[in-house]
């Protein structure tokens, strides 16, 4: 078992310590006797209430989820906050680097730049992919070619901005987070979620 698998099993054990009825009420989760259900970046997931295993829907079937970032983001979303009542979202967006004194915005991360290059020249394709994932196009901010509010978890959205490249400037992606986001996720998890979202968009546009 590698370190990633060990951390996934640690996440399962942590999840199983929580009062699931409280989680259902807190996050408005669909549920039955065996599973809790939630949508993450346009895909339906379920969590086994007995052993904590995460599965995703593929047509009529359910498949064991082995994507570390997906599994850990779902666990963190459900287990991060100790508050019984979560703070309401403010609609005030900021780069993730604003949440810490020492830290940089993912917009400067080579990982994000890789996706920006992949999206270059494909504004319409990126737009349609965002719509496919449930995104809502909003007014353009800071001259971005696309600005979308993307629902990524139950009642939780991020703001995605994309500037296409030209002769003077390279393409750029920026994800903005509601100022109360860290009441819902740990700082490190925002990077997992960011990667999962950009990967999902790229898979759709091909």
Where is each model-derived feature located?
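Domain-length accessory/inserted modules outside core catalytic folds
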Residues: 45, 100, 111-116, 142-144, ...
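Conserved aromatic-histidine-acidic binding/catalytic patches
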Residues: 62, 103, 114-117, 148, ...
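A recognition module on extended beta-rich or small alphabeta surfaces enriched in W/G with H and D/E
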Residues: 178-206
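Conserved binding-pocket/active-site segment within a compact domain
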Residues: 121-183
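Amphipathic, interaction-prone secondary-structure segments
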Residues: 24-50, 139-164
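Short amphipathic C-terminal alpha-helix that caps PH/PH-like domains
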Residues: 74, 78, 194-197
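Short Lys/Arg-enriched alpha/beta "domain-start" segment
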Residues: 1-34, 40, 70, 77-134
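Intrinsically disordered, low-complexity regulatory segments enriched in Ser/Thr/Pro
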Residues: 44-69, 163-188
């Amino acid at each position: 078992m590698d370190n990633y698998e060990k951390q996934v099993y640690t996440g399962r054990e942590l999840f199983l310590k929580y009062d699931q009825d409280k989680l259902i009420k807190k996050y408005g989760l669909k549920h039955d006797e065996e599973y809790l259900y939630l949508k993450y970046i346009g895909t339906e997931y379920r969590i086994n209430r007995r052993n904590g295993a995460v599965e995703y829907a593929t047509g009529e079937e359910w498949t064991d989820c082995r994507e570390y970032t997906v599994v850990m983001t779902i666990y963190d979303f459900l287990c991060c906050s100790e508050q019984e009542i979560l703070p309401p979202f403010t609609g005030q967006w900021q780069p993730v680097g604003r949440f810490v004194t020492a830290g940089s915005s993912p917009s400067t991360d080579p990982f994000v730049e890789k996706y920006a290059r992949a999206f270059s020249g494909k504004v319409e394709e990126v737009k349609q992919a965002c719509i496919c994932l449930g995104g809502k196009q909003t007014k353009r901010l800071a001259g971005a070619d696309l600005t979308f509010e993307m629902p990524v978890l139950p009642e939780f959205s991020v703001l995605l901005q994309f500037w296409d490249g030209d002769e003077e400037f390279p393409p750029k992606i920026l994800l903005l987070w509601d100022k109360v986001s860290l009441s819902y996720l740990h700082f490190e998890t925002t990077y997992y979620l960011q990667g999962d979202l950009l990967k999902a968009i790229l898979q759709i546009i091909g």
